[in-house]
């Protein structure tokens, strides 16, 4: 092969690589990542939503403190935030420790970044709420009509481990505003230690979903201390899921029979879960 032909081949390869990289977001979206919500939307002016996130920002091995940066998955924060705000709701952001919420930097990678993620990166108001989140211990949970718990790998380290969060979920469930409580992906770990008035697990016997053990294994992130499918089954929830050739392209939203809990399987489920939560409130208020 002559030098000129070699350069031409390299040029073709480089061109193809650029085309594939440019098309990658569309390819992933078509495969099922961050599906476009096509259901009904609702307006809830004057009502309030609380989004709760992890405060843990390191993907560490058991017993270690160092590791790659992690935190909340961007879309699991941005999707509910903008769905609630666009529906006229006032939205607050809380976290286990308060202060700046760590957002997993990989979830802002161009190929997996959603339109809501891009909107957040230009939104100084939303960024200020995330930088100055309310400590979960300081939250007056009875001020909210919706309580949404975001996931991400960081959530595996501190949601279920927080007795204060468990108490807040219990208080929300029995509170005067009768809020709809939800979570997606690892966010559902924030529900597993909430108790009913008899001291039993609040979500026992309820239909729920969360990220599957299969997806955790496929992504190679098994070092986290808790896995939602395993934990939901352990506490007696009725676990449901959808599957795909890779579960990161699957999605499922489950509403429990009482219509008090709405859970989403993974990062693809935040939009539908948020809309379903608003739907329950809208229909309840109109009845």
Where do the PLM segments sit?
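Catalytic nucleophile serine of serine hydrolases
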Residues: 185-187
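Extended, subdomain-level signal for the structured scaffold at the beginning of enzyme domains
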Residues: 2-178, 189-287
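Conserved, well-structured core segments that form or line functional sites
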Residues: 181
